[in-house]
Amino acid sequence: MALTAEQKKEILRSYGLHETDTGSPEAQIALLTKRIADLTEHLKVHKHDHHSRRGLLLLVGRRRRLIKYISQIDVERYRSLIERLGLRR
């Protein structure tokens, strides 16, 4: 299921650099993480939904590239974000 406007606002408020921040890597990674979690739950129920599985793999790849970018520009921001989101690294 797609994220509602309220869910997006809450995520952006928590992870963005300021109130209306939508473009920072932290905000983008947080939104992707929520979408990935939702798709993962969907695929647990609908195991043969291969179109959604492909979409999930694309989202994971996009998040991986953003995480790599933020780790190269500022290691402290990277470590903080990984800890806050509870991602493995």
UniProtKB/Swiss-Prot annotation:
Listed under GO biological process in this entry are: translation
Q: Which GO terms describe its cellular component?
A: cytosolic small ribosomal subunit; plasma membrane
Membrane spanning stretches: none
Recite the UniProt keywords alphabetically: Ribonucleoprotein, Ribosomal protein, RNA-binding, rRNA-binding
Identify the SUPFAM superfamilies for this entry. S15/NS1 RNA-binding domain
Question: GO MF annotations for this entry?
Answer: rRNA binding; structural constituent of ribosome
SMART domains cross-referenced by the UniProt entry = Ribosomal_S15 (SM01387)
Q: How does it assemble?
A: Part of the 30S ribosomal subunit. Forms a bridge to the 50S subunit in the 70S ribosome, contacting the 23S rRNA.
- PANTHER family from the UniProt entry: RIBOSOMAL PROTEIN S15, BACTERIAL AND ORGANELLAR, SMALL RIBOSOMAL SUBUNIT PROTEIN US15M
Which protein family is named in the record? Belongs to the universal ribosomal protein uS15 family.
User: What protein name applies here?
Assistant: Small ribosomal subunit protein uS15
Q: Which organism is it from?
A: Mycobacterium tuberculosis (strain ATCC 25618 / H37Rv)
